[in-house]
Amino acid sequence: MTWWKKLLGEDGASDKVDYYAEGADLLREGRFHDALTSFRLALKEAPGDPVVLQQIAIAYTRIGQTEEASKTYRHVLQKDPTAAGAHYGLAYLLLRQGEADEAVQHLEAFLQNPPSGPDAGEHVSHARSTLAQLRGEPGNLFSDL
């Protein structure tokens, strides 16, 4: 981990480190605590960055700190009420807590401003399916296509 090498003063540690990219890599590897450390360092370089904060919330969720994850998602939404990722993540945390009504609001907000990108379709389909189930509608995922 780059932050560890930098702390120990190993060769190359003085180079500019992309803590966000490092955190994303660690998150993909399942090294959630290490990812959280890297994202916190990225946040120091870009205080309040909603993208970094959403990654922190994901890391919190993966290590079981769902209350911290919820707080972080809510903080993002205070800064940017259209942050699709925060609506998505918070919706599923709320569902785990039995807060279906509030989760519906966040799923609707997510679907009003869905993300684009390689993984977006999977998340949009999942949100549509979940919303249909919560509303008691038939689960036809392809009705909007």
PLM regions and their residue ranges:
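Conserved structural position within tetratricopeptide repeats
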Residues: E10, L41-K44, R74-Q78, Q112
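Alpha-helical segment of the N-proximal tetratricopeptide repeat
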Residues: G12-G48
